[in-house]
Amino acid sequence: MNGELSFKYDNVMEENLGNLGISNGKLESFNNESSKIIEILKEKELNGEFGFLDVLNDNLDKYYELNEYSKNFENILIIGIGGSNLGLRAAETGILGSFTSRYEIPRIYYMDNSDPEKTHDILSNIDLEKTLVFVISKSGNTVETLANFFIVRNLMKKKNIDLEKHVVSITSGGELEKITKKENYIHFEVPENVGGRFSVLSSVGIAPLSCTSVDIKKLIDGAKSIEKSCKCEDIFKNPALMNAVIHKLMYNRGKTVSVMMPYIERLRSFGMWYGQLWAESLGKNGFGQTPVIAVGATSQHSQLQLYMDGPNDKIATFLKVNKYRNDLKIEYEYDHHLSGHNLSEVITSELVGTENSMKHNNIPNVKITLSKLNEITMGKLFLMYEMQTAISGELYGINAFDQPAVEYGKKIAHECLTGSKVDSENKYINGKYIITSK
């Protein structure tokens, strides 16, 4: 199969974890409650609250036109942060591979943070005359995005680069929308009912991806192919519902940390996207699990000791791929047990070891297996987790689509940038308890 996703949850069950596990009867008892939750979600969808599902029916022709236009460029520069970056990056690296392992054109660069050294390094290594710039911010006022874009825009103007032909704006308001209209950039809107962390399959992700070799129709088709099962009222046929319920039950039992651990580097960025989705959607009113991103087998040599012998406050999710795009055989002329095996066998055996040692230590874990990593399976994975998060919001009784707690920090940052430097330092920066080494 080229597009299969399976969800295994044996290692959260009572028969494997004893009293720390979940009984089948407990899951069956959730069927009545889950049917009510699915009905609520369907009603919200009808009311236009689930834009992340609506975008699956968008006409893709505008993106195919952009694909043709993008062939005039050698580089793609993505300026965006948070939901305007993480999902897109997860899709691109998940499907195509990491930048260092690809040499196809266009080359893709991500400018997210307002770190001056990172921005400088990118601009020192990219030819802006051969670059199509995507600037992405739903609000149009994201500080980090505007700051980086203003710097890039100024450099392009100094080089007499036609901004109208080199800039693609993806926004629905604010300063970015103003300058988009004033300078006539190529423009895509972000639907009002699609939040940043749920926007990977909207224009935020699909427009830039259309300029690469990603088959955007297959990506959307992958999401559509799992949509029906993720709306099923039967918990035993719905992977999103089952995983949401499992995580909520484990949260009730003190599992306040959610470890996402793919055993393939190409899904490292998916883990980062999950980190935002899970934390920002559910971390409210004193609730929420802290997402921790690990990568097998690397993190076995850094974090696993804590998982096995530290506080038993974690539930782990393993991501496995059955068929790697490339594999290498280990050849060694001396007697050694590794000789003759493929690297895929090594990393798979390490996953088996970690999965079963966690079970042995009564640490709950689930596993998602993809037949291979491509547009279809990435589409399935994205939509499953978006639905799982929406369902979890209902289980916790919270709004999974806002993020009120981050606004205060933005307000202070704005005050620091617009007010007196001395006043800002005295009010927010200078401390009383400081240890300094000179």
Swiss-Prot record:
Disulfide bonds: none
Subcellular location: Cytoplasm
GO cellular component, one term: cytosol
Gene Ontology MF term list: carbohydrate derivative binding; glucose-6-phosphate isomerase activity; monosaccharide binding
A GO BP entry: glycolytic process
InterPro entries: G6P_Isomerase, GPI, Phosphoglucose_isomerase_CS, SIS_dom_sf, SIS_PGI_1, SIS_PGI_2
Classification via Pfam families: PGI
PROSITE patterns given in the database record: P_GLUCOSE_ISOMERASE_1 (PS00765), P_GLUCOSE_ISOMERASE_2 (PS00174), P_GLUCOSE_ISOMERASE_3 (PS51463)
HAMAP family hit by this protein: G6P_isomerase (MF_00473)
Similarity field: Belongs to the GPI family.
Functional summary from the UniProt entry: Catalyzes the reversible isomerization of glucose-6-phosphate to fructose-6-phosphate.
This protein's name: Probable glucose-6-phosphate isomerase
Species in which this protein is naturally found: Methanococcus maripaludis (strain DSM 14266 / JCM 13030 / NBRC 101832 / S2 / LL)
